[in-house]
């Protein structure tokens, strides 16, 4: 069994995820072998199967770790003691920033999610739905209180915003004309403008 950490103290699961993320981004999920992943991580196949069970589990975890981070942050924004407009704007901008910060993970997942088994695909969709429902609840709270317009259904507003977020990997470039925070601010402001009465 591989050492639990490497010379820098990085635990085996994180090494495997980092190696898989890099290789999936460079070569594609379907063209990356388990052998390449374990060699890049400096571990044995036994270590991979101990921590993840399969290459498919690695793919699922690449996306799930970002979604967990985003869910925790959304919950924090949603529960904050602030006006609903500010909470929604903060959450809308944050999901853009965290997606850009993890662009390889998001890109890999959306390109490769069709490789997941129906069971794993369903699990990921349920986790995403939970996130979207919490986000939608902020929109609905603002609509009920009269802060936001009810002219457009909350579901459509949420789909509009997340359509933009999910396609960041197709056009955003770190060396482009906008910083990640500028993109986040623009998209959050677009969302709020769409909701103004």
Please provide the spans of the model-predicted regions.
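C-terminal peripheral helix-coil segments that are non-catalytic and often amphipathic
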Residues: 1-3, 93-101, 132-145, 163-164, ...
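N-terminal intrinsically disordered/low-complexity leader segments
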Residues: 1-11, 15-18, 81
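Helix-turn-helix
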Residues: 15, 19-57, 61
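Short coil/turn segments at alpha/beta junctions that flank glycine-rich nucleotide-binding fingerprints
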Residues: 26-30, 80-81, 102, 145, ...
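Hydrophobic/aromatic residues within well-ordered alpha-helical segments
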Residues: 55, 62, 66, 70, ...
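Hydrophobic alpha-helical connector segments
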Residues: 61, 75-105, 154-161, 184
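Amphipathic alpha-helical packing segments from all-alpha helical-bundle domains
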Residues: 68-71, 75, 119-145, 154-159, ...
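Amphipathic alpha-helical segments used for helix-helix packing
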Residues: 100-119, 170
